[in-house]
Amino acid sequence: LGTPKAVWAQTLAYPASTEFAQTRTTAILNYGPSVRCALSINHNYSKGPRHQAAEIRFDCEKGAAWVKLGLLLDYPKGEADEVWIYPKAGSDWEKAEFAGGWFPEAFIGTMSNLQRFSKGEDDSLLTSVEDAFQTMKLVEACYRSSEEGGTLL
């Protein structure tokens, strides 16, 4: 989908952890009239494991996916990561089997590529400065949206 055209967000500190800045965020990314992208992030959940969640959901016209980010549950011990796919022509969810986890593998590949590129061992970088710039542009837009406080009633 790329970079959204706008964002609505509220980001807050947790009252019992005043030494930290914003650790709870709700954001809606505007990709136009046919895409719904809502984020709910809470780094201060302290009510036990029963309803704790660290997940990503994709609900699309041609299928769906559900991802459990297990490391974020009981960090740093964590739980197993899971990926479930509901295919376009499917009638039930299918569990994707894989080895490893998203962390630290998600960072190892990018960082080792950067190190190999700097030594001349890789011809190109897997990621770009432009991508990082667009990510930070989105983060800053979330801060601005939160400061503006939304549409007044």
Question: Positions of the model-derived regions?
Answer:
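Active-site loop of classical SDR/Rossmann-like NAD(P)-dependent oxidoreductases
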Residues: 99-112, 127
